[in-house]
């Protein structure tokens, strides 16, 4: 049986708004297709990957930022956006791998919780390939990937009519001081970390991209088709 195919779109370092715009176009594209179980080998959607070009704080469906906090964060020079993903406030910025799979879960044989667990598994596997064997996901209601009490990967998704958007943010060489201005994901008493901090060397988004794609293909049991144009 042929594996479902997923379009791979690598945007490089781009403004966060550009990622959201492309995500919306893929959402409309999938929503316009017939909502039926697809035969084997059918395309299941797109995997959008990028590194944010500038600092952005985002709030999810559960909120997380008051108007006063929003004004304070903007005064720091960061963009602030309210998104449709699950979860509370977090930070995105240079040195971070953003992965937004826009997928019809029916074509992958997945339910939403399995999709979230699969994203966590991709991040755990990447950490293992980088030499961090203690990376773990936590049981619900927690999401993301941790090294002890330090969060290295945040996850927040949205799903409507079986179609997902948003995804994960994994800290490679992120300036972690940006997280000091919020309570990341609403979790008091926990810290954040990055691959660079844990490995004591500079780890770029470009470096981790190939092993991440290997992990994604293995865990989602799909093939990846490179997309020359993001449109």
Curated annotation (Swiss-Prot):
The record marks 151 as: Lowers pKa of active site Cys. PROSITE patterns: BPL_LPL_CATALYTIC. It catalyses: octanoyl-[ACP] + L-lysyl-[protein] = N(6)-octanoyl-L-lysyl-[protein] + holo-[ACP] + H(+). It is found in: Mitochondrion. InterPro entries: aa-tRNA-synth_II/BPL/LPL, BPL_LPL_catalytic, Octanoyltransferase. The keyword Acyltransferase applies. Pfam families: LplA-B_cat (PF21948). Keywords: Acyltransferase, Disease variant, Ligase, Mitochondrion, Transferase, Transit peptide. One of its GO terms (molecular function) is ligase activity. GO terms for cellular component: mitochondrial matrix; mitochondrion. Residues 1-31 form a transit peptide. Pathway: Protein modification; protein lipoylation via endogenous pathway; protein N(6)-(lipoyl)lysine from octanoyl-[acyl-carrier-protein]: step 1/2. One of its GO terms (biological process) is positive regulation of oxygen metabolic process. Its EC number is 2.3.1.181. Its main location: mitochondrion. CDD domains: LipB (cd16444). The keyword Cell membrane does not apply. It comes from the Eukaryota. Substrate binds at residues 85-92, 154-156, 167-169. PANTHER family: LIPOYLTRANSFERASE 2, MITOCHONDRIAL-RELATED (PTHR10993:SF7), OCTANOYLTRANSFERASE (PTHR10993). Catalyzes the transfer of endogenously produced octanoic acid from octanoyl-acyl-carrier-protein (octanoyl-ACP) onto the lipoyl domains of lipoate-dependent enzymes such as the protein H of the glycine cleavage system (GCSH). Lipoyl-ACP can also act as a substrate although octanoyl-ACP is likely to be the physiological substrate. It is linked to Encephalopathy, neonatal severe, with lactic acidosis and brain abnormalities: An autosomal recessive disorder characterized by severe encephalopathy with neonatal onset, metabolic features including lactic acidosis, little or no psychomotor development, and brain abnormalities including cerebral atrophy, cysts, and white matter abnormalities. In the reaction, the free carboxyl group of octanoic acid is attached via an amide linkage to the epsilon-amino group of a specific lysine residue of lipoyl domains of lipoate-dependent enzymes. NCBIfam families: lipB. This is Octanoyl-[acyl-carrier-protein]:protein N-octanoyltransferase LIPT2, mitochondrial. It comes from Homo sapiens. The gene is LIPT2.
